[in-house]
Amino acid sequence: MKLRIFDNEGERFYSPFNLAIFALLKRHRLSENAFFELVQGLSPYTDFFNINRYVEEYKEGDIFSDIFIEIPEELRNYKRVTEAVFSNHFKNRKSKDGVDVYWDFYNLLHDYLDNPSSVTIDKLLTCFENNKDKLNKAFGFGQNIFSQRTGERPSPEEFANQYQEMFEADLNTYLYQKFSLSKIFDQIREYSDTTKRIFKATGIISFDNGFVEIAYRELCTCIFEEAVIQSRVAGNIYEELRPEYDSYSEYEESVNSFYCDVTNLSQVLEYHDEKIKQVEDNIQKEFLGVSIEKIPTIIADKRRREFAEFINKHYPSEKVKEILELFNDRSNDRHIKEAVSPDATVPTIYEYMVGLAWYYFSGKRVDILNSYNLTLSANFEPLVHAGGGLGDIVIYEDDKVLMLEATLMNANSQKRGEWEPVLRHSINLKVEEETKNTRREVTSFFIADSFDANTINIWKAVAAVPLQSSLEKDKFTDNVVIMPINTDELSSLIDKESEYDEIISKVHKLFEVDKVNFDIDWREKFMEGIV
């Protein structure tokens, strides 16, 4: 909400995120292309006077009809220009070959204009067919400039009638306008992927089947008042009356600026006590008959139901098994991202799939959505893996707590990268449960594609010794259970849902066998006897 794009003087600004929220409040649903054009196509130099009407009536492609293209003086004539002039205005910074293709195409267009015949049409269409991708991207917004199938040749009369707009106009002006607008179109499409990732990461904007909506709409409409958000879409920083800043430099130039400072949403939107009370009242009206304290539970329950529907539709158990099998070979990484989420790393996707496998293993009874410590999009897609201070997945049940630690590190790397954090997370979780006296059994599962033999045995051995919490140094625990399970074994457990409780109980008994009395002061006592 604080992100702004400023003009060169650091005065006028445009806020893409506020525009996105405003558009989705007003329109409810937009196609992805229309959404990206709206958000990325505006700037601090845009006239926002009729932004309400503009957003309300916006159709895909409208952004390009509103852009004025200044035609260079050298191109303001009907004549064929020189190659030097052409190259100066029709540039391709990625490839000189591209400019050569444009030049050939330009000359063949003029050849046709000079002599409209079957011969010149054939040469023109042959050039187009051989360079279709480059030419469509440069002059056709990614669409076909000519609609003829490969090898198809219309008569001169048919061709002239079909492309009358192109050939009756000033060709130099026509091509330059198409070239300039296609470049803007290409930039919007190129950056749309990044824009999509950023908005998905917020968790409140949903992308599904080519459409964009606000997630938790019933809640967001209470929090984001349309008129307030509209007023924040654009403005002049010197006309704002904010105590936190009064210039561009104070807004975002330093680490102590308003932009870099940690601020809550009510501060950003300037919601004071009276306004916050109004928001609470609006939420109360939306959830009629429910106390304000119960509303988060209602929303969470709805979110869990939506997640269950999403999993049933997109990740049935057999598909989960198929995807898990792909992790055996890291050359499958591209296929894994295509199957799950191009926005997430493969290790993040592995954590996600481990959780789904466990969901099926439990007979769908565990709340895997709230057990993930990785970040999910509003569409339940994985985005960012769990932070270093937490277990990857922590599942709280009535009688037990399970922690799943997932890694794609190979057997050798595990010794350096996983031993300490997995052990630390397991100890801290068990100490926390014992401190709260919950009487729940705590079990950790270390899930990887393969294991080092020492890793397996060390996890078994640590159950026999007392271990110290890293968070509360005065607290110790023993019988820390860390059970290694490989990916193939986890996949097999998906079909063992009827044995879920029994298998976890067997794991505990397996580790309890080796529990022994252990003197945690053994080293000190020994050293006192010899020094």
Regions found by a protein language model. Give the residues of each.
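Catalytic core segments in nucleotide and nucleic-acid processing enzymes
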Residues: E250, Y259, L265, E270-V531
